[in-house]
């Protein structure tokens, strides 16, 4: 049942909330919320420290300080008496004391009955004054026929009693309607008004004499010094004018209230729409009228405010406060410090000022004080209420502490990082959590983490206490708690017992992406540090140099199940960013595997034959054969599966036999570092290493080429292929169906039942999966059989209990899903073991000097001397000399690097070289600095925008390089230069991290509500993709293969012979993608997020493959957040140095790096550098001529484009280009709208204006991809598409037709299409609008959810507009549901499909009788 609840919010459950709406609170609403009036400014009694009656902490109003204690007589009650009235004494009955818990102090409100109407600060200060827009006051000054609009500042002066306004002219010509009377012109205006009024009365009459006297007094005052300085007495004159005429002049909130009461909103709307139509016509006639555009924008905003009040049906007078709510006492606490001192919330001081001024005003009114004193008190009261509402926004008279700090008002408590939204609603402190330093846990399994037992004892305390009491180790909770605190040895077995099947969640800050939070099975360790598996560190971006991690405990059964099924480390093998494994071995492990897989010609024991693998190991242990020696084993000993088809002996090193032994029997044998597509290349590769019986082994091996060992990249490829081969293909439900059919008599034949199952692609299970599943099933059944036999004989046909089946299912399911991780664990163990055995250590003698270094340095110095000579002769400029010098030293360093590369090419025993070649640590660049030269250093120069626009050389690199290497040692200048450069790197990184974090936050807000919600949206619009090519360098940025793999086709794909390669509606897998590219196809039309028809969400087919699971995305996946994290997480790696070449600020520099990314995502109107000129038409370049002007600085070109008009007539368009801009076109070139004519960044709004949304989408996608790919970071297109879709998701209405939209409003594109569809179906006029591009900063503010928008930025502005329009938040997105305490509408709380990753039912449910 849907019930509208608008009062007593504390009494409803947050789970029952379906919608939230904001509205203006009426004085009656405030009285209904309130439990009493606060009329005294006191807080607590200074002697007793008890709250004062009628004060800001009154227990009768705000609730008791002690649970269920009467606030009047002090009598204590039970919880069962809650909400009853205390009747213990007569005073209790009179005061109506209610029995409540102290929690009431968090939601019980009071009120202050104001003795004067006060205008709510937000409505005249936020967003250029809502009141000014609503009233739209205009006045005809003198004889002018064009009215002057009264400004926001003039209305503020009116509110603060600094000026008066003519509310009614009373037929007086000297008074203009809405005229603001300032102190400077008051004397003249009042004089003219009185002269006009006196004419209505006959001379000699009482009225005439009184008016004549007033005119005489006014003349005396205005001519006197006091009158000129302090002005006239407004109030006396106003009374005279109102007494003798029907004119009315007023000031303050009363004047505004009068104006709001008189306004006719519908008439105002009609007038504004008529004026808007006139302005629109003028703009269409002449598009260059900038002032008219500004006027139109002002009218749009005014219309928006008027429409808000009309549609919400609210009375604008409710913007005036008569009863001021007082927030609950516990939300503005008074805390006792040491001794008798107290610390209080700033709000209490602000409330106190209001009460004091309000009470004083009441006394002045009662004493009939002069009007001027009362008006002054009302102004002070207005200022006091303003300070309470929003002290920071007050331009003057901010209320400050003694130290000068502005007090925090209610608005400040909402906004910013420390405000209610971000500090208390979106981010909360979590109980059952702890943190500690992390250390490596090399012996852990991948799903395990080492938890210090002291932490476990505290985190799992309630369970341990229950266990101790159940087993009668203690008699009470208190004793158990004491035992845990004292760390009594009795507790440790119970701690170990309690943590079974209780996963823990580890989080490392900064949580940049979802791999920063993963779940593990806890393993108790005696140390105080958390042990972390070495392979998962990459996901957390953790190292062991003092990093700390937080631990959290999921408590409810649902949370535990979700943690185990979705968050365990074995479910997070692929990185969501690019779909590549993130658990690749690194450092020690890589070094160990590199050492293990090395081959050495002529090593001890080479050519030896061993009949078994164990015999080979024994020989290696007895040192009769070396690890790197190539030996021979019978084929069936190594690969028994293939031995049936291939006979003979296999050649490899001892190390490689050991390495291959850890892989499953049906995984291809790894012979060398050529590990691409092992399955496909296996038959051709294996022939070289298989010897028929009777071959001379030693002779054959001597002629065999020595293979390269496995480096980091090769190992990563192997890991990927392990994942592709052994990642689970079945759902839990499938395995449950098999278990349900098995008993102790037939479990040995389980493989027959598994053969009948089909994987998620509807295909038969591969042999590796069948063999492993049957192996796990047979093992678990036999274990259970043995266990049951201990209690007596077990019949083979015995039917298993449901709980036994569920237990079997859990064990088999875990092993099946853990296949990849178990192999990775073996790789890890092997890597660590052999890196230790390799004995790798480094000495200074390992660094080999570059042989030709000094020759290259000499060459560079000679070149620089020549440059200096040319410069001295005036043949080159200083800038040219600098650029050439930098280029030369860069080339010299590259030459030294190449020379070093050649010298260490065959040095495989050098430890440093081994580390570098294997990819364990360091690269050739580090080696060059050690053994060659350090090279050029960064210079800390501020690059200005004007430098980029004028293409000046920015000297961001020190001209003199560091010629020494670290081996030789640096001179004092070189040392200084080095530290200077290093420091710049550190500061850049620190600044970059903060900017990157802010970018991620904005992106999350942009895309947070995008969730996969449907199977198919049936869109027939596609998105044509091709290689993304950098047109400047003509290099491929993103190949077609990457862009189509994992996406659905929108149209059939045919090769040049007309043979169909793939059908529309099918997902392109890697093999199909390779086939399409091999056929020479350049363009493919795919389903895209940019064309998806689902409102604010996306369907499975438009999204395609989930990169984190390597299969089709599941319904419920929060792809918007994944996209934001994937783009934001590598942001820190993007360089912030705009001019990283140190040369001329050319286009390549300007368009690279973090700065350019921010420009694109925020849709900057003034990008860094000189913007590119673009073609506005389809046409041909007919002429490029020099622009000859007298002023040499204005030289440039004129590009003439010939195009056809709508009437098919030829026309010319001339574009002026500055001389410094580089042309990208020549005469005769065909151009299309949006095409660059010169180098430089394109302004997004301009591109959208001359082309269409699809062109802009392609441009953004290409530019963002280029920025990341230049840094070697690969991000999937689909993530960028999600952000681009949001950037282009709004339409600005230019004609409203028969719709309810108003001209100038910005609406969601899906709402626009929906409304227009309905209008067209009813034969009505549709609305017309233009798609607009908005940056990531503005999109969240335009959200349909005011909660999501207000929690992002500009909180007060969002709330003001939501209040006046009475906006309804339907709680559709993720943020708004978190704010109200709901589960998010994604993942396990979405309408997921059966057998999907989010279908995490209790295993028992698969075997329940009613489930069959």
Curated annotation (Swiss-Prot):
Keywords for the protein's UniProt record, in alphabetical order: DNA-directed RNA polymerase, Magnesium, Metal-binding, Nucleotidyltransferase, Transcription, Transferase, Zinc
EC number: 2.7.7.6
Cofactor note: Binds 1 Mg(2+) ion per subunit.
Binding site for Mg(2+): 543, 545, 547
Entry keyword Flavoprotein: no
InterPro entries linked: DNA-dir_RpoC_beta_prime, DNA-dir_RpoC_beta_prime_bact, RNA_pol_asu, RNA_pol_N, RNA_pol_Rpb1_1, RNA_pol_Rpb1_3, RNA_pol_Rpb1_3_sf, RNA_pol_Rpb1_4
Family, similarity comment: Belongs to the RNA polymerase beta' chain family.
Protein name, entry field: DNA-directed RNA polymerase subunit beta'
Organism, as annotated: Mesomycoplasma hyopneumoniae (strain J / ATCC 25934 / NCTC 10110) (Mycoplasma hyopneumoniae)
Organism placement in taxonomy: Bacteria, Bacillati, Mycoplasmatota, Mycoplasmoidales, Metamycoplasmataceae
Gene field: rpoC
């Amino acid at each position: 049942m849907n019930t509208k609840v608008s009062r007593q919010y504390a009494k409803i459950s947050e789970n029952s909330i379906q919608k939230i709406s904001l509205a203006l609170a009426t004085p009656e609403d405030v009285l209904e919320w309130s439990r009493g009036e606060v009329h005294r400014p006191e807080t607590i009694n200074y002697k007793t420290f008890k709250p004062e009656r009628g004060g800001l902490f009154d227990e009768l109003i705000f609730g008791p300080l002690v649970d269920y204690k009467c606030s009047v007589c002090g009598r204590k009650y039970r919880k069962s008496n809650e909400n009853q009235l205390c009747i213990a004494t007569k005073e209790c009955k009179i005061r109506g004391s209610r029995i409540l818990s102290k929690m009431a102090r968090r939601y019980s409100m009071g009120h202050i009955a104001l003795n004067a109407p006060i205008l709510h600060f937000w409505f005249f200060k936020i967003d250029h004054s809502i009141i000014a827009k609503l009233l739209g006051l205009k006045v005809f000054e003198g004889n002018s026929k064009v009215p002057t609009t009264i400004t926001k500042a003039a209305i503020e002066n009116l509110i603060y009693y600094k000026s008066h306004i003519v509310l009614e002219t009373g037929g007086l010509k000297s008074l203009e309607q809405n005229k603001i009377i300032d102190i400077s012109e008051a004397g003249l205006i009042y004089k003219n008004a009185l002269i006009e009024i006196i004419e209505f009365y006959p001379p000699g009459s009482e009225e005439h004499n009184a008016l004549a006297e007033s005119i005489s007094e006014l003349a005396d005052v205005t001519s006197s010094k006091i009158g000129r300085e302090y002005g006239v007495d407004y109030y006396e004159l106003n009374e005279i004018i109102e007494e003798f005429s029907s004119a009315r002049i007023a000031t303050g909130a009363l004047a505004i209230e009068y104006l709001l009461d008189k306004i006719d909103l519908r008439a105002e709307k009609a007038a504004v729409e008529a004026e808007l139509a006139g302005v629109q016509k003028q703009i269409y006639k002449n598009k260059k009228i900038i002032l008219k555009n500004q006027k139109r924008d002002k009218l749009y905003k005014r219309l928006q405010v008027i429409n808000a009040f009309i549609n919400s049906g609210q009375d604008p007078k409710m913007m005036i406060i008569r009863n001021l709510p007082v927030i609950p006492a516990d939300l503005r606490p008074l805390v006792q410090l040491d001794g008798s001192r107290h610390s209080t919330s700033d709000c209490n001081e602000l409330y106190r000022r209001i009460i004091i001024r309000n009470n004083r005003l009441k006394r002045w009114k009662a004493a009939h004080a002069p009007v001027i004193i009362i008006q002054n008190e009302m102004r002070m009261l207005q200022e006091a209420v303003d300070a309470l509402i929003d002290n920071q926004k007050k331009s003057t008279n901010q209320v400050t502490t003694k130290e000068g700090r502005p007090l925090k008002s209610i608005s400040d408590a909402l906004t910013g990082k420390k405000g209610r939204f971000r500090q208390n609603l979106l981010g909360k402190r979590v109980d059952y959590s702890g943190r500690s330093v992390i250390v490596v846990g090399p012996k852990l399994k991948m799903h395990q983490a080492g938890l210090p037992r002291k932490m476990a004892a505290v985190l799992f305390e309630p369970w341990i206490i229950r266990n101790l009491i159940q087993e009668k180790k203690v008699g009470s909770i208190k004793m158990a708690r004491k035992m845990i605190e004292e760390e009594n040895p009795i507790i440790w077995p119970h701690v170990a017992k309690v943590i079974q099947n209780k996963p823990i969640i580890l989080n490392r800050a900064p949580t940049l992406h979802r791999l920063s939070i993963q779940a593990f099975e806890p393993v108790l360790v005696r140390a105080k540090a958390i042990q972390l598996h070495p392979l998962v560190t990459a996901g957390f971006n953790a190292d062991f140099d003092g990093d700390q991690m937080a631990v959290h405990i999921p408590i409810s059964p649902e949370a535990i199940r979700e943690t185990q099924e979705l968050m365990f480390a074995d479910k997070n093998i692929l990185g969501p960013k690019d779909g590549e494994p993130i658990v690749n071995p690194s450092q020690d492990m890589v070094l160990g595997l590199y050492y293990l897989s090395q081959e050495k010609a002529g090593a001890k024991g080479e050519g030896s034959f061993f009949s078994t693998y164990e015999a080979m190991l024994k020989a290696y242990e007895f040192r009769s054969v070396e690890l790197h020696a190539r030996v021979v084993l019978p084929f069936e000993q190594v690969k028994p599966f293939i031995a049936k088809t291939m006979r003979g002996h296999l050649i490899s090193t001892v190390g490689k036999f050991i390495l291959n032994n850890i892989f499953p029997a049906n995984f291809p044998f790894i012979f060398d570092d050529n590990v691409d597509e092992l399955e496909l290349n296996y038959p051709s590769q294996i022939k070289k290493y298989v010897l028929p019986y009777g071959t001379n082994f030693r002779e054959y091996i001597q002629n065999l080429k020595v293979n390269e060992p496995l480096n980091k990249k090769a190992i990563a490829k192997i890991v990927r292929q392990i994942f592709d081969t052994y990642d689970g293909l079945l759902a839990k439900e499938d395995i449950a169906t098999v278990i349900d059919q098995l008993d102790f008599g037939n479990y040995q034949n389980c493989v027959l039942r598994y053969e009948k199952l089909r994987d998620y692609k509807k295909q038969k299970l591969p042999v590796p999966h069948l063999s492993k599943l049957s192996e796990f099933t047979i093992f678990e059944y036999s274990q259970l059989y043995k266990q049951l036999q201990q209690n007596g004989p077990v019949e083979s046909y015995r039917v298993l209990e449901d709980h036994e089946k569920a237990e079997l299912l859990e064990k088999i399911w875990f092993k099946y899903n853990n296949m990849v991780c178990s192999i990775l664990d073996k790789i890890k163990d092997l890597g660590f073991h052999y890196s230790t055995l390799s004995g790798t250590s480094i000495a200074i003698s390992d660094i080999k000097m570059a042989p030709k270094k000094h020759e290259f340095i000499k060459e560079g110095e000679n070149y620089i001397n020549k440059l200096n000579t040319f410069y001295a002769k005036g043949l080159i400029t200083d800038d040219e000399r600098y650029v050439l010098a930098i280029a030369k030293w860069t080339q010299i360093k590259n030459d030294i690097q190449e020379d070093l590369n050649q010298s260490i090419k065959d040095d495989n025993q050098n430890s440093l070289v081994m580390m570098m070649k294997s990819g364990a640590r360091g690269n050739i660049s580090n080696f060059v600095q050690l053994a060659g030269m350090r090279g050029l250093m960064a210079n800390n120069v501020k690059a200005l925008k004007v430098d980029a626009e004028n293409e000046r050389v920015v000297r961001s690199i020190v001209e003199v390089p560091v010629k020494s290497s670290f081996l030789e040692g640096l001179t004092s200048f070189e040392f200084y230069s080095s530290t200077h450069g290093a420091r710049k790197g550190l500061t850049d990184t620190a600044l970059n991290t903060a900017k990157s974090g802010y970018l991620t936050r904005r992106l999350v807000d942009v895309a947070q509500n995008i969730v996969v919600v449907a199977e198919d949206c049936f869109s027939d619009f596609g998105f044509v993709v091709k290689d993304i090519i950098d047109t400047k360098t003509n290099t491929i940025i993103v190949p077609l293969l990457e862009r189509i793999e994992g996406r659905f086709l929108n149209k059939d794909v045919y090769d040049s012979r007309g043979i169909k390669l793939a059908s529309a509606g099918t997902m392109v897998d890697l093999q199909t993608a390779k086939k399409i590219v091999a056929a020479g196809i350049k363009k493919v039309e795919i389903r895209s997020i940019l064309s998806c028809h689902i409102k604010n969400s996306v369907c499975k087919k438009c999204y395609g493959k989930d990169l984190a699971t390597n299969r089709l995305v599941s319904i419920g996946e929060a792809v918007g957040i994944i996209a934001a994290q994937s783009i934001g997480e590598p942001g820190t790696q993007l360089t912030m140095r705009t001019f990283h070449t140190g040369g001329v600020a050319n286009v390549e520099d300007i368009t690279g790096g973090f700065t350019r990314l921010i420009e694109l995502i925020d849709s900057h109107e003034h990008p860094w550098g000189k913007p590119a000129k673009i073609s506005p038409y389809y046409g041909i370049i007919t002429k490029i001529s020099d622009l000859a002007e007298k002023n040499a600085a204005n030289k440039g070109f004129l590009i003439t484009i010939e195009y056809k008009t709508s009437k098919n007539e030829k026309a010319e368009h001339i574009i002026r280009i500055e001389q410094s801009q580089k042309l990208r076109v020549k005469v005769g070139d065909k151009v299309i709208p949006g095409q660059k004519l010169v180098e430089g960044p394109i302004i997004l709004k301009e591109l959208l204006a001359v082309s269409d949304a699809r062109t802009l989408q392609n441009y953004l996608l290409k530019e963002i991809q280029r920025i990341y790919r230049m840094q070697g970071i690969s991000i999937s297109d689909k993530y960028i598409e999600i952000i681009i879709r949001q950037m282009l998701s709004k339409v600005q209405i230019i004609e409203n037709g028969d719709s309810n939209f108003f001209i100038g409003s910005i609406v969601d594109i899906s709402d626009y299409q929906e409304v227009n569809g309905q209008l067209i179906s009813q034969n009505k006029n549709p609305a017309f609008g233009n798609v607009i591009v908005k940056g990531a900063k503005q999109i969240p503010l335009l959200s349909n959810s005011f909660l999501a928008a207000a929690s992002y930025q500009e909180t007060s502005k969002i709330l003001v507009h939501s209040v006046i329009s009475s906006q309804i938040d339907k709680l559709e997105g993720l943020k708004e549901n978190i704010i109200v305490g709901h589960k998010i509408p994604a993942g396990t709380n979405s309408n997921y499909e059966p057998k999907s990753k989010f279908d995490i039912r209790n295993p028992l449910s698969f075997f329940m009788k009613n489930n069959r």
